[in-house]
């Protein structure tokens, strides 16, 4: 299995902190955001390579970080230099798949979230299901729902529909940017793009994929900290106690 880490954004809402430094390498406690994610995922011993998808501006920072790690980490530079010219998450996924000629199952995650639970729980869930899977959590606030990916559930965790940033949310189930694609479904990303799925938000591909094949959603067993602005970063630094579940 490969783990694709989406890290090509420019984090403009965190300026000046991230004007010349990538958000995924900011420290939370004693480790960087990426360290928390990679070190946790690695404990299950099913990922044989981590692929960090970066923009050109920050690629050298990720290369320097990768050189300090014991895991096999490949940094892919998507060639963009500005927020205005960014490819978007789905196109970045496709760029990495084609550049590295990846044919494996994939864990695809955002590089700017920390969790208080181990992602290995989600990986085990997906491997047992044997199909593409996502995670979900209950969000009571309509304002937050309208800024997220929202799913409609059927029986047995099946995802019937997903919408990114819906004006009228169909449910209270939010989908965070942590996905498992089977090898077969990972090869359909280009088809999804060509069929008109959105390319900026990473969940746009899942919104298309769940209409083509079965996708299941595991309820998150803990809390996710999304670092979107300076205020949320300071809050995470004050509250986060590591992976406790």
List the predicted regions and their residue ranges.
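Short acidic-glycine loop/turn motifs at beta-strand connectors
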Residues: 152-158
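Conserved N-terminal catalytic core of the sugar/cofactor nucleotidyltransferase
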Residues: 2-5, 13, 27, 31-108
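Conserved donor-nucleotide/metal-binding helix-loop-beta segment in metal-dependent transferases, i.e.
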Residues: 117-146
